[in-house]
């Protein structure tokens, strides 16, 4: 451990405590933090990523959570002697002091700007997979999250699709990779197929997203979106992908949508052949309409 000067020791004691009974990182808390770390998409806490900006830190996970007061002093000295500015140091201490339930008092003592408090609160709650609390802090005015890629991936991998949509809509991070486009489109499609479809058309790999969107709504048995698909002015490539997927299974929603699509595209003969070979389709409303349509054209 680096040797502390007297003024540094006073600051340390003023921030934390030298009493063992005050030390919050017991085995239960330590295990919880390590579990949260393993559940992160890249096995890194947001605090790990922040610590990695300090020159010389190669393994942030070995520093947090500290296993003893000596370890905490070592982390304190690394931050104190680091190449980062005072405001960033205060942000690190604010995050650590949340574990000690002293962060609010500290922020008042050093006049830590509110937007930085909310930013660190957001990261703290993301690290603990408390997504609603995290988003409520990260979407406040003047808060500028600086790890949008990790935030998007974290929300998507934890199936927090509404929060992801809110984050993208409010913060407006550049969706400049296919993975980010994919996370957003496949979140959006769960709530608005039409909005997701229009977004998909502007993406770098629209047909790949189109196939993923169709698979998702079919697998989730989203009948309303399937009805909407049939009425869309699809391109030839989109139609080919759609027909291929619909013909891949004999499940009811696949068959219903395929029959409706064949009727809509005026492929009456193929629609009649499909319905005649399916007991399920013979009972459908689309089949009744199909036979009326066929009798009128005969």
From Swiss-Prot:
Keywords: Cytoplasm, Nucleus
Disulfide feature: none
GO cellular component: a single term: cytosol
Cellular localisation: Cytoplasm; Nucleus
Lineage: Eukaryota, Fungi, Dikarya, Ascomycota, Taphrinomycotina
Chief site of localization: cytoplasm
InterPro entries tied to this protein: ELYS_dom
A GO BP annotation: nuclear pore complex assembly
Matches recorded under Pfam families: ELYS (PF13934)
Protein name as catalogued: Uncharacterized protein ely5
